């Protein structure tokens, strides 16, 4: 449980301290010192997740925090395989729909190089939402 809390804090610190000048998955950086609090891996992680999910990347530390709280409470709920599958499916649908809504809210005219409008997943989900609705 302590490891999960530490992972939550680390991922959140990596996302919050993202800098476009750091070397990451989509850029080589400006050549200066790494500004990300998570170091080189943190810069890479934040770059990848912000490009892939946009602002919805912040849902991942949130779900880890909720999972930590659930473990801390030592929940007596039924924890069958089906319940875990439903929780995972619910989280997946939440992330996909949040990315799509971000894309629709921020508009398709934005520069998606920073992943602002739901990231790459938002482009796919938002385009699908435009076609369907």
Where are these regions (language model features)?
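Alpha-helical transmembrane segments used as membrane anchors
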Residues: 1-133
């Amino acid at each position: 449980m302590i490891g999960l809390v530490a992972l939550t804090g680390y991922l959140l610190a990596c996302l919050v301290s993202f800098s476009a000048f750091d070397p990451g998955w989509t850029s080589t950086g400006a050549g200066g010192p790494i500004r990300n609090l998570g170091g080189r891996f943190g810069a890479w992680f934040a770059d990848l997740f912000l490009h892939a999910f946009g602002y919805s990347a912040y849902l991942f530390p949130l779900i880890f925090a909720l999972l930590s709280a659930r473990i801390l409470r030592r929940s007596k709920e039924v924890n069958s395989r089906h319940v875990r599958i439903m929780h995972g499916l619910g989280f997946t649908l939440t992330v996909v729909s949040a990315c799509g809504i971000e894309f629709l809210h921020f508009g398709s005219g934005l520069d998606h190089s920073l992943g602002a409008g739901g990231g790459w997943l938002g482009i796919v989900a938002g385009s699908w939402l435009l076609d369907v609705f």
